[in-house]
UniProtKB/Swiss-Prot annotation:
Superkingdom field: Viruses
Pfam family, one: SNF2-rel_dom
Encoding gene per record: 41
Protein's name according to its UniProt entry: Putative protein p41
Gene3D superfamilies xrefs: P-loop containing nucleotide triphosphate hydrolases (3.40.50.300), Tandem AAA-ATPase domain (3.40.50.10810)
Residues in Helicase ATP-binding domain copies: 14-186
Gene Ontology MF terms: ATP binding
Length: 460
């Protein structure tokens, strides 16, 4: 366990959550929202200000791994046990019986089930809605089933509420009413959605269409944030980070059980070979190809480059990153061709960085929301900095030069040269307890691959 030293902006989050019972925290990825929120909960439990368990609503991956892992990381959170309520109905019911846990996590898809099964015995005093934009579609009538179920207990049975997101209004101000209702039951933005739109929007009837759209009135962009300001903490990374250095963020994902079994079988073969004879330096990386492919999510099944998908854990993680980016274009580094095929299928609006010069132009003009690039195609002289400041490593490989080159394409120096006063975020999607972690170690230490593999073998 590590010793937690809050950064200045994390102190702001902690104090905000302690001071205001129902509130919003708007802060981007990499700003430590999870650790700060757990720290605030720890303070509330220690002081006796909170005695009931807490429920965290989150996407599946975040509920399953992010919150439990964060609690295990820091020594000051040793008294907080995080229990995910995931899996089969039987597993979820068993999880609810954990009397030692003070924090429970559940994915949004299981909200209706949870509210139904608990009924009048609802035990949670605090709800934390992670990636709270999932609540934007709530309406008092004709809303989604999940938010409707949540609305039944949000104000009647819950006395503390936190909306966490880096992008509160990815599609415009219309996204705010549903989230805000869970904080104050419509006190600030209107008791109903119609009241909200009538006050701050004008309806535009489209010629020849039966439906219309809303456009915010001129004063809406000022008045709506102002109306929420007393219960909202909004943090901009550019105000807190040194924009001269990239901000690295590791996003761990768990391999599903079947994928883990497949991975262990392939890893065992590699380590047997390592134990039988010394692998030459040039051959060491090649021996890890299949294992790293499994960590990424698919594997070639024959010599014709046909492939089989093993899991989609990294796809889910990338979805969260894209949602958190709030419309800011994202550059995604992949390694395997099957990575690219899976990415293009999962994100139809994404585009591969090909040889067509128009692709590069469109990216730098903000016309491509997701650009998939192999690091080998991002050598010297390629300018990607105008298109965005977010880079995601979807899969991992040993080549340090290629790794450094793609970072440099949108890195702080390029951003400054182009006149962009903004930090660069680099997200590494890493499969836990796999060679992904060893590749990450090589990037940090620049040690020989075969030495790192031998060390990894000894740890097993």
């Amino acid at each position: 366990m590590k010793t937690f030293t809050p950064r200045p902006y994390q102190h702001l989050i902690i104090n905000h959550l302690l001071d205001i019972k129902r509130s919003n925290v708007w802060a981007g990825m990499g700003m430590g929202k999870t650790a700060a929120t757990l720290t605030a909960l720890e303070n509330l439990y220690l002081s006796g200000s909170e005695t009931k368990p807490t429920l965290v609503l989150a996407p599946l991956r975040v509920a399953q791994s992010t919150w439990p892992d964060e609690a295990l990381k820091w020594s000051h959170l040793r008294n907080i046990e995080v229990q995910p309520i995931i899996g089969s109905a039987k597993a979820r019911i068993a999880a609810l019986k954990n009397t030692h846990a003070s924090v429970f996590t559940v994915n949004y898809d299981n909200l209706v089930w949870l509210v139904d099964i608990l009924g009048d015995t609802w035990p949670f005093g605090t709800i934390i809605a992670d990636e709270s934009t999932r609540l934007k579609s709530f309406r008092l009538r004709k809303g989604g089933k999940r938010t409707a179920a949540l609305a039944k207990i949000a104000h009647k049975s819950v006395h503390r509420w936190v909306n966490l997101t880096g992008t509160p209004s990815p599609n415009g101000l219309m996204d705010l009413w549903g989230q805000a209702w869970f904080v104050d039951q419509g006190e600030r933005l209107g008791r109903t959605y119609n009241a909200f739109t009538s006050r701050w929007f004008k309806r535009i009837q489209l010629p020849g269409q039966q439906w219309s759209r809303f456009e915010p009135l001129g004063f809406a962009h000022l008045q709506i944030p102002l109306a929420l300001s007393d219960v909202t903490l909004s943090l901009d990374a550019a105000d807190w980070f040194d924009i001269d250095e990239p901000i690295h963020n590791v996003i761990n994902v768990e391999l599903p059980a079947k994928a883990r079994a497949h991975y262990h079988a392939m890893e065992k073969e590699l380590f047997l070979e390592l134990g039988e004879s010394a692998i030459e330096a040039l051959n060491a990386a090649a021996k890890t190809i299949k294992i790293l492919q499994i960590a990424s999510g698919a594997i070639y099944s024959d010599d014709n480059r046909n492939w089989t998908e093993i899991h989609d854990a990294k796809i889910q993680a990338l979805e969260s990153i894209v949602n958190e980016s709030g419309g800011t274009p994202v550059l995604v580094a992949y390694h395997w061709k099957h990575d690219l095929e899976r990415l293009l299928k999962a994100f139809p609006k994404g585009k591969n960085l090909d040889a067509n010069p128009r692709t590069l132009t469109d990216w730098n003009n903000g016309k491509i929301p997701l650009l998939f690039a192999h690091p080998a195609s991002c050598g010297h002289g390629l300018n990607l900095q105008d298109g965005g400041n977010i880079l995601v490593f979807f899969s991992h490989w040993w080549d340090l030069e290629q790794y450094q080159q793609i970072i440099e394409r949108i890195g702080p120096t390029r951003q400054a040269q182009a006149g962009h006063n903004r930090p660069v975020f680099i997200h590494h999607i890493v499969a836990k307890d796999t060679l992904d972690e060893v590749v990450m170690e090589r990037r940090n230490s620049k040690r020989a691959i075969q030495d790192l593999l031998l060390e990894a073998m000894k740890r097993k």
